[in-house]
Amino acid sequence: MKTKIIVIVGPTAVGKTALAIEVAKRFNGEVVSGDSQQVYRGLDIGTAKASPEEQAAVPHHLIDVREITESYSAFDFVSEAKMTIEGIHNRGKLAIIAGGTGLYIQSLLEGYHLGGETPHEEILAYRASLEPYSDEELAHLVDQAGLEIPQFNRRRAMRALEIAHFGQDLENQETLYEPLIICLDDERSQLYERINHRVDLMFEAGLLDEAKWLFDHSPNVQAAKGIGYKELFPYFRGEQTLEEASESLKQATRRFAKRQLTWFRNRMQVTFYQIGESGVQDRILSQIEEFLDD
């Protein structure tokens, strides 16, 4: 029997953390961060981690598990998330995955029991190799492999190519989880206003000092490549004014949010909820209750 989990995704600044905490309180759950940057110790403001008070109210996992000089991959996330979810389930609680790193969450949900000779790491590496291809290029690869995909989309194409590449050993495996995937969204103008406002609040909370610490200690590590830090480095080098760097950060974050939505829309089977609609949280909680009772 597959383990039921709740997955909350969506663009940055849309309210994933707040909803995850509410769901955890309502359904006796624990939150697993699905964010590639929140794993790093010391990067708190720019990654929008749950506050210490929020983490004290509801257990959070996969936050502050790496130093800024260490690397972190989709394979690391899947391996650690699987162990974390198993522990939550064994405690009789509900695992709630919340985050915006689509590749990590998709890899977790499409992770397979591999009893044959194909390690999960190889599958993730192959999947990552397909990411740069456009839809047209993927369709060409599918045709070359002699595969047929009704109602073509990226997720189906990549899955079919994985099966063709690794063979029946992969095709016959079952996924580990039964997920309910909720994707939060907002009207574009409203979302962009939320992003701009959150960046302003981050500066008030000390983002500049946090980014300067990263710039002084490890400007070239993987942790420094995330949105929220590298956009401020030109200011530290004297190449931009603070106002210019702030606007650059807001623009980069808005573009990132757009890419996130495209990912979730095209590559994952999600239920969309507009956060600006009346009663949306009650509808989400009702859907979760029905899912868990089914």
UniProtKB/Swiss-Prot annotation:
Which is an annotated GO molecular function term of this record?
A: tRNA dimethylallyltransferase activity
- Alphabetized UniProt keyword annotations: ATP-binding, Magnesium, Nucleotide-binding, Transferase, tRNA processing
Single biological process term from Gene Ontology: tRNA modification
Query: Does the keyword Signal feature in the UniProt annotation?
Result: no
Residues the record marks as site: Interaction with substrate tRNA? T101, R127
The segments labelled Interaction with substrate tRNA in the record are 35-38
Which reaction(s) does the protein catalyse, per the Swiss-Prot or TrEMBL entry?
adenosine(37) in tRNA + dimethylallyl diphosphate = N(6)-dimethylallyladenosine(37) in tRNA + diphosphate
List where the protein spans the membrane.
none
Cofactor section: Mg(2+)
UniProt-annotated binding residues for ATP:
G10, P11, T12, A13, V14, G15, K16, T17
The UniProt annotation places substrate binding at T12, A13, V14, G15, K16, T17
Q: What is its EC number?
A: 2.5.1.75
Q: Which domain of life is it from?
A: Bacteria
Pfam families associated with the record: IPPT (PF01715)
Q: What does this protein do?
A: Catalyzes the transfer of a dimethylallyl group onto the adenine at position 37 in tRNAs that read codons beginning with uridine, leading to the formation of N6-(dimethylallyl)adenosine (i(6)A).
| PANTHER family tied to this protein | TRNA DIMETHYLALLYLTRANSFERASE
| Complex and partners | Monomer.
NCBIfam families, A to Z: miaA
Against HAMAP family, the record matches this protein to:
IPP_trans (MF_00185)
Per the record, the similarity remark reads: Belongs to the IPP transferase family.
Q: What is this protein called?
A: tRNA dimethylallyltransferase
List the gene name: miaA
